[in-house]
Every structure is written in structure tokens, then in C-alpha cells.
Amino acid sequence: MNADRKERWDIWIEEYLANALAARSDNKRPRGKLAGKRKLGVSTLLLALLTFTFIFAFPSSPAHKIVTAVLGGSDCSTSTTSISNAPLGMRIALVDQLGSQYPNPGFVENVTLSARKAGYSLDYISPNSASIDFFINLPTYHYNLIILRTHGVAVGSAAIATSDTYSQYNRINDQLLDRLGAIESNGTLLFTLNPGFVSYVMCGKFPNTIILAMTCGLLTSSTYPQAFIGKGAGAVIGWNGAVTVSHTDLVFESLITELLTGNGVDRSLQVATERWGPDPLTGAQLLSYPNSTSMSI
């Protein structure tokens, strides 16, 4: 392909992804202003589908070869995370994506001690290790409890932030299919995981795992927790809106302690919320999905 054609292709990709991201929920705008941009996103997607249909009708064309190479999505075969020695047994994962911007060594230490007292080993996933590739194989590690101390989206569609820097040229297929998004964190754009990533990209099944989502707004609607449940999780606990880091740390430390003493989800949630209440700044409440479950780890 000559330089001019490659440049036109780069410009097309740039414009398409910019429009697609603009059409998604902007966490700085109220929901009422999103309808027009959603329509733009649908129109752009239809145009993209027509373009790809034309390109793939001619498999020998240079454009077809480039599209095939560039649009490869995330799946088990493309992940660089080894699953051959996946940990089994009584295990807990603490995914501390927030740790680089909002470190809380006291929280990490207390949760680790509580886990050990209850007979569990805890795998600490450092801020730089919360990558897309890590999340791809997360179900296959057979954790009993997964703690997601990550950034999220307070307004609009829920999402879980990763440690991977966003690029419109990476994992394009997953972006086009709305399985990956982006969020600004401390001046840097990061990839985020949308519900479709959990449903269609993650490998394997969770073994009735309890998911603790310390992130903002994961239970604003049932879409994200349903994706986890459909992937084999037993229950999801998270916030129904924006939450401050200090409050989520306090509440979840209490919640985790209750779970590790053998209390079920309902009882643990009741104890933690009665002790700390909603976020005093934002009013966000801690909820579980399903709404009522006595399951325990």
C-alpha cells in the first residue's frame, strides 16, 4: 500500500474512533445530553460496517490485509498472561489499580491479614499489573473472592479501569464492539472494560466467585453485575453512584472482614452499611446483585 493510501486509512481510523468515543457516555455530562451523540454513534457504526463489508468482499486487496491485521481483538489466544499454572484453592485477588494515585497500604495490610487468618492466600495485583491481558484470564484463576479497587465511571454506562494506556490503534475490534472504552485518570487516558468484555472476551467461568467492586457506579444498573453473573460469579457488591476513595476503603474493609469471618453476603453488607452508611459526600449506596443472597465464600 502506498504512503498516501496508508495515511488516508490512519485518518479514517482516527476519525471513526473519535466519533465512537464521543458517542459514548461522557462522565462529565448529564445523561440527558447523550441521546444525540448515541445517534451519531449508530450512524457511524453503520457506515463502518458498510465499509468493512466492501473491503472483505475483496480479500486480495491491500485494505483487506491491513484491516485483518489491525482489527484483531482480545481473546484467550492473544493474551500474554499464562494460565497453565492458574492458582487453585482458597484464594483472594486484590486488584489495586487505584494504588498508584490513591495508595492505601493500611487497607492492603488489613485485608491481607484478615485473609490469612481465615485460611486464604491473597494475590496482590499491583497498579501497573491490572492490564487487559490480566483481566482476560481472570475467571480461570479460580479466585473465591475478587476485590476490584479500581477507577470507574460515575455517570453513564459502568466501566472498570485498567492500567493500560489508551490508544485508538490498539484492540480496535474490541473498541468497535463496545467491549473496551476509555477514561481519563490523573491526566492519562486508560482503557476501560465494558460489560461486553466480561461476557465475550474473558476466558472460562468464575467458580461462583464473589466480586467486590470498589469502583464508582458499577451497580448503577443491572447490566454490569448481570455480565459477571452470566460469567459464573455468585454475587456482585458495588456502589450505585460516585464514591470517594476514603469512604469505599472504609466500607469495603469492614465488608471483607465480615465475609472472611463466615457471614453471608446479606449479613456482611448489612453490618458494613449500618456501620458506615452511604458516602457522606455523594450519597452513593452499597448494593448487592442479586438483591438478596445468603451465599458466603
Question: At which residue positions do the language-model features occur?
Answer:
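N-terminal accessory interaction module
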Residues: 1-2, 10
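Short amphipathic alpha-helical segments and helix-helix/interface helices
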Residues: 112, 135-136, 198-202, 225-226, ...
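Extracytoplasmic/periplasmic, Sec-exported soluble proteins
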Residues: 99-107, 138, 189-194, 198, ...
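A domain-level signal for caspase-like cysteine endopeptidase catalytic cores
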Residues: 66, 70-175
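Cysteine protease catalytic core and zymogen-processing segment of caspase-like enzymes
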Residues: 155-237
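Active-site-proximal C-terminal subdomain of hydrolase catalytic domains
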Residues: 210-297
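Secretory targeting signatures
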Residues: 9-12, 16-17, 23-70, 146, ...
